[in-house]
Every structure is written in structure tokens, then in C-alpha cells.
Amino acid sequence: MKHIKKILAAGICLAASLYLTPAMAAYEIDPDYTMKYNDPGKIEQRYRWHGPYEVKSVVLSDGEAKYGNYKYKVWYPVQQAGRERPRPLVITLNGTGGSCDKDEPIFRHLASWGFVVAGNTDAQTAPGFSAEWTLDQALAANQDSKSPLYHQIDEKKIGIVGYSQGGAGAYNTLEGKDGDKFKTMVTVSGVTESIGKKLHLPVWIYDPSKVTIPVFMAAGTGILDRKLITPLDEMKENYSKIQSKTAAMGRRKDADHLDIQTAADAYITAWLRWQLDDDIYAKRVFTGKDPEILRNPAWDNAEVRNPETTQPNRLKSELINGSSRKFGG
């Protein structure tokens, strides 16, 4: 019965995707995407570029029925001999029509900063099943002496990142059997309640008040995100319902649904470096007396909350970002 429910949920998502505008269709990310952005934030600039690690990849499985017939692939940092240590794991969920093959450049970028990044080719990720299967296989590889991932993953430091309908998938994964294994979540233009209702997709509707881990929510100010996928009022409502004491949100100016993954990539990397790798430089984007995201003119509607921040208000961000300056991306 459980397997039948999974098939039905995936079928409903697939049917609904036929009604989505072609403008929302996934596309292959340019391997040189980091070159197109002129980031005004100093810390943002640092995490825009590739990190210090060479990156390799390995396919965990491909076309196995028990894993939904998807391909599962991992990108991981190559560590210096004698200096190896288990690295944080990041599970990714695609947007509608997306795949790890199309998004490979951003996964390589994240892995270059010391993360083991696991993705798949599931184009309908909202139910969260493929995220669970990705995690299962990554953790199995971590215990397999024949795998290049053997003892490479820190199983106490696992994050989840969901783009578009994958945002709903991230919430659903947290409510699943492995929810307590995740230490942080990032949603990137995550679908909100209104679009789920318009498409009659209950699997796209979730309860943010059940989330107790640190969360970063990013979106763009372009028309698709603003009017359809991640409207500001609903994004704020979701943010307010998150139960974690640590959270942040922001909307990247001049970015829309199709390029928000690359536009927000630097701050997503910084968030994960802070939350999963204790990077004290990266945390300055979101903490302290003057968090960079609140004064970065390339970001709008930014908010932060955490025990270390003394000025967690969006008013400052809105006043600073009120100009009409435009930035690359």
C-alpha cells in the first residue's frame, strides 16, 4: 500500500506539471555561471567563487526500480592524503523538470567548498521520496569499504536544499522517516500554498510550523517568483511560522525563477558553511550587529533571526535596498 501511495503521488505531480508554464521548465546551468555576477557583498563575493577542493563524482545507482528508476549521483571533495575528515552531506531536490545532470555546475561548486553533495534525476520531487532514497544510498556508501565515499560523510552534519517544488519536497522529507537526521534546510524559490491550491496539488502544501531546524529561504524579485511561485507575503508567512530560533530569508534583486539557483548560490553556500561546517566568516552574512545580507543592495526583503544578532529587523534591509541600482544576474 505504501508503494502504491508513492506511485500515485508522483503521478499527480507529473500530471500537474503539464499545466505549468514553459517559462518554469528547467534548463542546464552554465558551467561558467559564477562569471556573470557582480556581487556587491564582500562575503558574497568570497563564496561566489569555487572553493579550495578539487571535485570528483560517483554514480550510486541508475535505473533501479526500488529507487524510482532515477539516477543518483554524488559530488565530493578530494581531500589531501593524511588530512581527511568526514565532510557534511547535502541532499538536493530538483525543481519541476530538473535533474542533477542539469544542475551539476552548482553541485560541483558546493562540493568545492567541502561538502558531499547528493542529487538525482527525479523531476517531480515534492513528495520527498527520492530525497529519502538519496540519503539511504549516500549513508550506505559511507559504510561501504569499496566506495570512494567510505567514511567520507559526517552523518551528524546533514543538510537539505530544495528548489521550486523541491522546496515542498524538503518540508515533506523533514516530516518523513529520516527527518531527524537533518540539521538545516534551504529552500530556493520554494513553492508556496497558493500555487499548490491552484494546481490542486496537496503534496505541494506543507506546514512550516513543524520545522525546528535552522532554515534559509531565498527567492527572486522577478515576476514568476513574485506573482506565482514564491509571493512575498506567503514567503514571510512561512518564515514567521518556522519554529527554529535561527532562520534567514531574502529575495535576490533582478533574479527570477529560472536563475535564482545561481543568483543565490553564494549565500546558500555561506549558510551551509556556517550551519554544517562552523565557518565563522560565512556566518557573518547572517549574524552579528551588522549581517551582510541586511545591507547588501543586491538583496531585498532580507530578515535574520538568531541568538547572536542584535538587529534582526527587515526595516534596515528595506531602507538600504530601496534604491533602483541593478546588479548582474
Task: Kindly give the residue locations of the regions a language model identified.
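Gly/Ser-rich "nucleophile elbow"/oxyanion-hole loop immediately N-terminal to the catalytic nucleophile
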Residues: 79-86, 129-168, 175-177
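Alpha/beta-hydrolase-fold serine-hydrolase catalytic core, especially in secreted/extracellular enzymes
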Residues: 253-329
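The feature captures the conserved acid-bearing segment of alpha/beta-hydrolase catalytic domains
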Residues: 183-260
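Short beta-strand element of the alpha/beta-hydrolase
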Residues: 84-95
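Bacterial N-terminal signal peptides that target proteins for export
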Residues: 1-9
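C-terminal segment of classical bacterial N-terminal signal peptides
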Residues: 17-23
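N-terminal cap/lid segment of alpha/beta-hydrolase-fold proteins
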Residues: 26-85
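Short amphipathic alpha-helix adjacent to the substrate-entry channel of hydrolases
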Residues: 101-119
